[in-house]
């Protein structure tokens, strides 16, 4: 069934076959170096370095919503969220990481590969 296939996929690690120099690869580097790993995990890429208090992002691109189901998963909402999470969801634990526009663009491209 579709559900069984979904369960099998959700148990797999993220695809790590990114082309070095691609925007998605650049986004993975942002993920690894901007502080995301303090709270988030992506299976097969990097385990959480701090407390596992944030959502697992392994299959983020398959989700219809994010931010506690408050926002539709699209590039417009992700751009706003990554620029200033508290503006979209006051009281969120997600910090403003002061990412540049390029870093946000790359991170969104990377998150889009996580299926």
Predicted features and spans:
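C-terminal capping alpha-helices of c-type cytochrome domains
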Residues: 2-13, 76-115
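Electrostatic cytochrome c docking/interface patches
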Residues: 2-32
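Flexible gly/pro/ser-rich segments immediately N-terminal to CXXCH heme-c attachment motifs
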Residues: 22, 33, 70-73, 94-101
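Periplasmic/extracellular electron-transfer cofactor-ligation site
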Residues: 15, 28-59, 63-68, 83-90, ...
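A general alpha-helical scaffold signature found inside nucleotide-binding enzyme cores
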Residues: 55, 73-77
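Residue-level detector of alpha-helical recognition elements and their boundaries
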Residues: 18, 42-43, 72, 93, ...
């Amino acid at each position: 069934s579709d559900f069984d296939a979904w369960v099998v996929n959700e148990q797999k690690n993220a695809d790590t076959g990114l082309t070095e120099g691609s925007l998605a690869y650049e986004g993975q580097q942002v993920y690894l170096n901007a502080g995301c790993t303090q709270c988030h995990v992506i299976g097969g890429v990097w385990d959480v370095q701090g407390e596992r208090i944030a959502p697992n992002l392994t299959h983020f691109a398959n989700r219809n919503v994010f931010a506690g189901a408050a926002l539709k998963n699209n590039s417009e909402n992700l751009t706003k969220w990554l620029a200033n999470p508290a503006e979209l969801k006051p009281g969120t634990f997600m910090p403003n990481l002061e990412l540049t526009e390029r870093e946000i663009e790359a991170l969104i491209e990377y998150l889009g590969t996580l299926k």
